Amino acid sequence: MTPELTVLALAALLQGVQFALMSVAANLDLGMAKTASPRDIDRLGRPLHEMLATKPARLYRAFNNHFEALILFTVAVVVVSLADASTPFTATCAWVYLGARIAYVPAYYFGLVPWRSLIFFVGAVATFAMILATLI
């Protein structure tokens, strides 16, 4: 397995960890009666994520943000893998992406401004660098 595919697998596991963190925080915040309900707007009045306190809501947003970033990172890994273009540079970019995504969660949770945005930017640059390195 290439380093990029290894990092992709680890990024998917990170998504699972983020899901667990967000789920536990949401259940502690809102209670099982709401989180295990059918979540009908007419019954609850608004979506569950809008009812969350600040910190659980941040975990929710970080979780969703990783879905968005993971889509592009997956594209980058597929491009590198199918082109058989894995290099030390693309491998380093993949690890940088994962490090940035790991750092992003506490940065978002603790509201670290401007660090959260800078961490996101590092991961995004690493992702696009993988694609560009494969194309040139």
Go through each PLM region and give its residues.
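A loop-to-helix transmembrane entry motif
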Residues: 54-67
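Juxtamembrane boundary at the C-terminal end of a transmembrane helix
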Residues: 87, 129-136
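Core segments of transmembrane alpha-helices
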Residues: 64-77
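Interfacial loop-to-transmembrane junctions
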Residues: 100-125
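Helical transmembrane-bundle signal
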Residues: 12-22, 74, 78, 101-104, ...
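Transmembrane helix-loop junctions in multipass membrane proteins, especially transporters and channels
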Residues: 23, 27-31, 84-85, 113, ...
